Regions:
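Conserved beta-strand-loop surface patch within small alpha/beta domains used
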Residues: 1-63, 72-77
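Conserved residues at the C-terminal ends of beta-strands
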Residues: 69
Length: 77
């Protein structure tokens, strides 16, 4: 498992039972996971990323993936 995958799974565990969400960002230093705040009115069923997080992730580098969890489901990376 990569460091990025480990960070994604750790974030999903911290957010449960709500959905986690974030971006995988490619920077000059390498790939990294950028966790975002789920601002959905129903975070246990849906996700909505905070616009500020989206902007900060974009400023870090190239967004190469959008990631979110399905609480109660199996991880699929």
């Amino acid at each position: 498992m990569t460091e990025t995958e480990s960070a994604i799974l750790a974030h999903a565990r911290r957010c449960a039972p709500a959905e986690s969400c974030g971006f995988v960002v490619r920077t000059p230093e390498g790939e990294r996971y950028f966790p975002c705040v789920n601002i959905s009115a129903e975070p246990e069923d849906y996700f909505r990323m905070a616009p500020e997080d989206w902007l900060q992730a974009k400023m870090q580098g190239e967004i190469v993936a959008l990631v979110h969890s399905h609480p109660g489901g199996l991880p699929w990376l």
